Amino acid sequence: MFRILTINPGSTSTKLSIFEDERMVKMQNFSHSPDELGRFQKILDQLEFREKIARQFVEETGYSLSSFSAFVSRGGLLDPIPGGVYLVDGLMIKTLKSGKNGEHASNLGAIIAHRFSSETGVPAYVVDPVVVDEMEDVARVSGHPNYQRKSIFHALNQKTVAKEVARMMNKRYEEMNLVVAHMGGGISIAAHRKGRVIDVNNALDGDGPFTPERSGTLPLTQLVDLCFSGKFTYEEMKKRIVGNGGLVAYLGTSDAREVVRRIKQGDEWAKRVYRAMAYQIAKWIGKMAAVLKGEVDFIVLTGGLAHEKEFLVPWITKRVSFIAPVLVFPGSNEEKALALSALRVLRGEEKPKNYSEESRRWRERYDSYLDGILR
């Protein structure tokens, strides 16, 4: 029996769980108030606070850290790497502590896991961080050599659901072609070809369909005009793209349940905006089907919005079901995804990857691509 501790720090919470093989023994979501987090100037300053919570969770459950077989966390904002399970190493910790790719609470998970590993000798892993990059070079070309398309998406849930579909069909993930749409506060739509995400919208930086809180792809000239209008600061413009865009901008809420309630009460404007979001999601699914040359085994809808089966899921399904059968996997169980990934490594079913080596290889390939684009 393998005992696994999962560590999943989010912006306003820390989710911790204990698994014994596939069975979840305990899970707890610790919410953090603005007052609690407000005393920390930087994300990294929260490290001791979050680590203490994890230690207390383990102690109160009656286990010692040395009784675990593995510690596993979300990957933070690392350098781009292919998908998979990675052994936490010194370069990874250095990258996360530097914040060179951005500061996010998810950066803390691997650092905490590494501390526990250093104390006990138990291995620490991260799984499919948001920076997973398996894009083909043709997908990186943006339309101008000074700008490159980036792969930033919900890699953990996307890969987990894709592998679950393959398992259901008695196939390997590496044998299937899928279009997977993760629909939550951010929306990522990816083309999975034979085990690799060869194209995906950048779910964070203003690319793809609009979402409950993000604007998605916008008309560029209008955006440039607004940037130089003198009416908004740099930070205000960024907030319009991520945070105050999408449903928030149109309807004043990011809660799909509230939007559905308004639609049922006869709010035609809410219905029009919500239908437009479904339209854009469907359009991006069509784009990814084209990336796969129409050879799509299944279209998969997942994430929190996939629970909304009165309007959103039917509207999307009606537009894309001609491409391939549509499967719906509501929500995203990141804790289970982390634990099962670590379990595959512990059982010898999957080899952990080396972050230092894989990030170096990715950089060499990317530099070669840039040489071709910029020459």
Curated annotation (Swiss-Prot):
Its EC number is 2.7.2.7. Keywords: ATP-binding, Cytoplasm, Kinase, Nucleotide-binding, Transferase. GO terms for cellular component: cytoplasm. It is an enzyme of class 2 (transferase). SUPFAM superfamilies: Actin-like ATPase domain. It catalyses: butanoate + ATP = butanoyl phosphate + ADP. InterPro entries: Aliphatic_acid_kin_short-chain, Aliphatic_acid_kinase_CS, ATPase_NBD, Butyrate_kin. It is found in: Cytoplasm. Pfam families: Acetate_kinase (PF00871). PROSITE patterns: ACETATE_KINASE_1, ACETATE_KINASE_2. CDD domains: ASKHA_NBD_BK (cd24011). GO terms for molecular function: acetate kinase activity; ATP binding; butyrate kinase activity. GO terms for biological process: acetate metabolic process. Its main location: cytoplasm. Belongs to the acetokinase family. NCBIfam families: butyr_kinase, PRK03011.1-5. HAMAP family: Butyrate_kinase. This is Probable butyrate kinase 2. It comes from Thermotoga maritima (strain ATCC 43589 / DSM 3109 / JCM 10099 / NBRC 100826 / MSB8).
